[in-house]
UniProtKB/Swiss-Prot annotation, chain A:
Family per similarity comment: Belongs to the BchN/ChlN family.
Protein known as: Light-independent protochlorophyllide reductase subunit N
Cofactor: [4Fe-4S] cluster
Purpose of the protein: Component of the dark-operative protochlorophyllide reductase (DPOR) that uses Mg-ATP and reduced ferredoxin to reduce ring D of protochlorophyllide (Pchlide) to form chlorophyllide a (Chlide). This reaction is light-independent. The NB-protein (BchN-BchB) is the catalytic component of the complex.
Species this chain originates from: Rhodopseudomonas palustris (strain BisA53)
Reactions this protein catalyses: chlorophyllide a + oxidized 2[4Fe-4S]-[ferredoxin] + 2 ADP + 2 phosphate = protochlorophyllide a + reduced 2[4Fe-4S]-[ferredoxin] + 2 ATP + 2 H2O
Free-text remark on how the cofactor is bound: Binds 1 [4Fe-4S] cluster per heterodimer. The cluster is bound at the heterodimer interface by residues from both subunits.
Entry keywords, A to Z: 4Fe-4S, ATP-binding, Bacteriochlorophyll biosynthesis, Chlorophyll biosynthesis, Iron, Iron-sulfur, Metal-binding, Nucleotide-binding, Oxidoreductase, Photosynthesis
Amino acid sequence: MNARAEGCTAAPDPSSRVVRHERGQHEVFCGLTGIVWLHRKIQDAFFLVVGSRTCAHLIQSAAGVMIFAEPRFGTAIMEEKDLAGLTDANDELDRIVTQLIARRPDIKLLFLVGSCPSEVIKLDLSRAALRLSQRFSPAVRVLSYSGSGLETTFTQGEDACLASLVPVLPASTGTEASLLVVGSLADVVEDQFIRLFDGLGIGSVQFFPPRNSGSMPSVGPNTKFLLAQPFLPDTARELEHRGAKRLAAPFPLGVEGTTGWLRAAANAFGVDEALFDKVTQPARVRAERALDKFRKELSGRRLFFFPDSQLEIPLARFLSRELSMELVEVGTPYLHREHLAEELKLLPADAAITEGQDVDLQLDRCREARPDIVVCGLGLANPLEAEGMTTKWAIELVFTPIQGYDQASDLAELFARPLVRRAKLVA
Amino acid sequence: MQLTVWTYEGPPHVGAMRVATGMEQLHYVLHAPQGDTYADLLFTMIERRNKRPPVTYTTFAARDLGKDTAELFMSAARNAYARFKPQAMIVGASCTGSLIQDDPGGLAKSLGFSIPVIPIDLPAYQRKENWGASETFYQLVRAIAGPKAPPPGTKRAERAPGQRAKCNLLGPTALGFRHRDDITEITKLLGQLGIDVNVVAPMGATPADLTRLGEADFNVVLYPEVASQAASWLQRIFHQPFTKTIPIGVSATREFVREVAGLAGVDPEPMLAAASTRLPWYSHSVDSTYLTNKRVFIFGDATHAIASARIASEELGFKVVGLGTYSREFGRDVREAAAKYGVEALITDDYLEVEAKVAELHPELVLGTQMERHIAKRLGVPCAVISAPVHVQDFPARYAPQMGFEGANVIFDTWVHPLMMGLEEHLLAMFKDDFEFKDGALPSHLGTGHAPASAPAVAEVAVALPQSAPVLDGAASEPAPTTPAPTGAVWAPEAEKELLKIPFFVRGKARRNTERFANENGVATITVETLYDAKAHFAR
C-alpha cells in the first residue's frame, strides 16, 4: 500500500521512534469484517461481497448471533464455472445484482466488495460498479472497494469503503470553512460532539460516513477535516485530493485525547481559549471524576496489545497517561506515522511498538512478560485465559461507544472489567 | 455465481480444520491469505476450546504475491514442525491459496520431515465443509492406518473366545453438534453390551491412535457426513463391517443396539430390557395428547434430519409436513425418508429457498439449524435446533447428547419446550380478547411476554409472499402490507373476522386451505360458510 511510503518520509521528530517490524502469521481479520458495523451505520446501503464461500462464512461468523433478521449484506459466491471462464463473470455479477435489487428495492447505495479470490483472478469490480451504476441510476448508486485480506486488515475495510465514497461526495459551494468529522462513530457520540462544536461556535459540522446515503457531506477546498479514527489514510488522501485539509490531532479517546482533538478544531476555526475552556471544562471535570473510580483498579497494571484495529496506540496512550498503566508491548497491524504523530508525541518514550505480527513469536514474548492484561482477538483470548492470563478482547473496542468525554470512563471500565471478574471468581 | 445471505456450511478447509482440531498431535499448515484466521474463533469462541487450533496459516498479503509465496509456505511449514513437533502433519490451501497454485503437498514433501505429511486437496469452489472433513479424515486414515493393512486376500482372524469385542467410533469432530456428549452416551451403551471402544476418531485421537484402527472388530459410524468414506475404506482393506443405523431416537437406538450386538456376537436383549428412557412414557402420558399431528418442518444435515423425522412422526406423533437437507451428498437418503411421510424432500443449500418453503407450508414447529431459527423468528413459528450449523448456545455446559436413551430424553424436552402448553392453547382458542394472553402472544411459559402486535400479520402475509420477504431489518417489525391472496377468491369481511377466531398457529394453514377450496370449487367470495365448508373438507 502506497500510504506507507508517504507516512515514513513525512515523519517528524517525535515519531521517529524505534518500531519493531514483524512479518509472519497474522492472527487478524480481513477488511470484509468492516461490513459488520458499516451496514448498520449507513442504513440504506447494501454490501455485496464478491468472493468465495470462505468470505460468506467469515462475515456470518463475525456477525454471529447479532443478526436474526435479514441482514443488509450478502455474498456472490464464485463457483468453478466462474473461475474456469465458462461464464462471463461480469454477466453473472449483473444477474446477481439485478436479482438483489429486485428483492430489496429500498437499497439506495450498493457496494461491490472485493475479496482475495476476486482480487487474485483480477475481476474488475470498479468497472462493474460503473456499468451497474449507469444501469440502475438514479435509484441506486453502485460503488466498489476491496476488503480482501491481501490488502486490508480489519478496520482498513472501513478506510477502503469511505475512500470509495469520497470521489462521489457533492462539492461544497460556500466560501465559509466547514468541519468534517471522518470515521464511523456511535450515534450517541456524534450527538455529543455536535453539541460541543455548537458550543464552540463551529456551526457547520458534517459527519462521514453519514447515517444514510441521502445525507452525504459536501467537500471542497474550504473543508477542514478531523479524523475520528486512526485507520483512515486512504480516505484522508482522497479528501485531500478534493482540496480538504486535515487537522493534525490526537484521537478523541480519553479526556486528554478528546481535548486535543477538539482543540485542533477550535484552533482551526479561531475559537478563543476562554470560550474553549468554558465549553469543555464541565465535561472534562465530569470525565476526570468518572475516571477516578478506575484509577485504583488499573494503575500500575501491565498491559500487552496484540495487533488488531490500529486503535492500539491511542488506547495505549490513554491507558498509560490517564490511568497509569504500564505498557509492555503495543502491537498494531499498521502504523501511519503522519496521522499518529500527535499520539506518538504523547506515548511514553520507552513504549515498545510493534508493527505487523508473527503470532507465535509475539505469544512467546507475551508469555515471557506475563502482563496483567492482554488485549487480543477472539482466536487468542480463551486460549490465553486458559493459560492463566487476563484478556480483553479487542473487537469490542470497535463496537462500543468509546470516544469523547462522556465515554472515557466506559472505555476504562472495558479494561477494568476482566480484572474485576478474575478477582471475583473463586472457582 | 450464487447469491448467498446465509451459508449452511463453511468452505472445505474448515472441515479439514474440524478434523485437525478434534485430534491431538496433528498439525495443519494452511496456505491462506491474511484474515482466514477468523476460523480460529469458531473453535475458541463457539466451541469455547481452551487451546488455539493446531493450524498454522501462511497469511500471505498482496505484497507477497509479487514474491515467492511458495517459500513463504515452506518456512511456515518448517516453523510449525519445529515448534509444535506433531506426530503427523496435513497441508493444504484455502480457496485463495488454491488459486495461486503453489502445490503445498509437493513443497512439504520436499522438506523431508520425519513424520507423515499428508496433502489434502480440497476443491473450494465445488465442495463444502462436511465434504472437506470427510475427505480429510479419509486421507488421514488411508495414510496412517494403511501401512498396517493385512495383505490382500487374507481373512480377518477370529476373536479369541472370551475376549470382549472392540469397535471404533468414527465421525465425531470439533465443532460437531453435540459430538462431545454423543461419544459419552454411545460409549456407555456399548459398555453395557460388553463391547469396548478401541479408538474414537477423529475427536480425541492422535495419529498414533489411527495406526490402531485395524485392531477393532468393527466400526460404529456415528456421523456418516464425516466418516462413511473412511469406514467404507476400512471395510474394504481391513474387512471391518460398519454400522448403518444412527442411534438418534428410541427406536433407532434399539435398532442400533441390535445391530452392534449382531456385529459383536453378543445378546442385546438383557441390556435392552434393563435400559431406561423416559421419552416413550412422557410421549404416552395424556399431557402429550395435544402434540398429536402438530405440523412440523424439518431441515438440517441428512443424518439429523432423517433421524428427527422418524422421532417426530413415530415417537412424538407429529405430522411431518416438510423434510429437507443441505447435505447434497446424502440427497438420495433424504428423498427416500421424505417419501415415507408423503412429502417431497427439499435438497438445497439456498437459505432463501428454505425460507420460502417454511412460509408456504405454515408449520406449527420448525426443527432445523441456526438458520431456521432466523426463519422461524421472522415468521413467528416455534423452533428447536437439531443440527449444525449452530451457535454458541448449542455447545452447552450441561450433558446434552442427541444419541442413545439419554439423547431421547434431551430431545423430548427440547422439542416440546417452544410449543405453547396445552391448557394455554385451549384457553386462547376460547377467549380471544384477553388483554394479556392475547392472540399471537408468545407462550407465557417462555417468559418474554408478548410478541410484537404485528406478529400475526407477518406470519399470515408470509403465505402470500414466499418470494418477497420483508426488506430492511426494520421492516420485519412493521405491520406487513395486506397483499391480496394469490387466488381469484376474495374474502368477505365477516369471513376475514371469523378467520381471526382460529388459533394463531394454525390460522395461516386455515387461510390457505380455504383459498384452495374456494378456487377448486369456483367460489368467488369467501364467506363464513366457505370457511367452514373448507374446514369440513380438509378435516383430518
